[in-house]
């Protein structure tokens, strides 16, 4: 299975970045051990800004005018599993990941609009969407704010895939307030990746 791992670190603390990197590396190692083809996209240097030219081309016949976005879109379309590893920023997606979604999952890639104006799914090859998220807030605060990042990835993104596409969410809340939680979290990541 072709697995695309999208790694979107925010400007998080060193300890949080270490946990995210460990989760990403664990996912890669576990998937490769199970003989999956794994590609990692690190969004650290990805420009999240949807420029005026891209916005103007958004609903055209060729909305991908940037070479990097075009390459990333091809990787998404060729993957059977999409694993997104990120740290939540104010209970939603970090700017790099939100910009990546806006610039890469354009009409013709993740969805299309037919002549009657009906939206058609575009990511029909996806069997799995997995989110691995590190939260700065508590579980209760995240639930009260309705967890925008999770909703975008598991609901909105899934609407672009087949109705049988499976989803999974692995979350770690306020790791600095819990002792020894990192190893348990990495164990959960390993077990989930082994089931893909």
Language-model features: locations:
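N-terminal beta1-alpha1-beta2 submodule of the flavodoxin-like/Rossmannoid cofactor-binding fold
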Residues: 1-109, 187-196
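Short, basic/glycine-rich phosphate-binding loops at helix/coil junctions
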Residues: 48-55, 130-133, 169
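Glycine-rich phosphate/pyrophosphate-binding loop and the adjoining helix
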Residues: 140-144, 148-196
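Hydrophobic beta-strand segments of well-ordered beta-sheets in folded domains
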Residues: 1-4, 126-131, 167
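Short, structured loop/turn "capping" segments at alpha-beta junctions
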Residues: 107-112, 163-167
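A short, flexible beta-alpha/helix-coil linker loop
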Residues: 9-13, 135-139, 174-177
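Short, glycine-/small-residue-rich phosphate/pyrophosphate-handling segment
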Residues: 113-159
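Conserved residues at the C-terminal ends of beta-strands
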Residues: 85, 132, 173
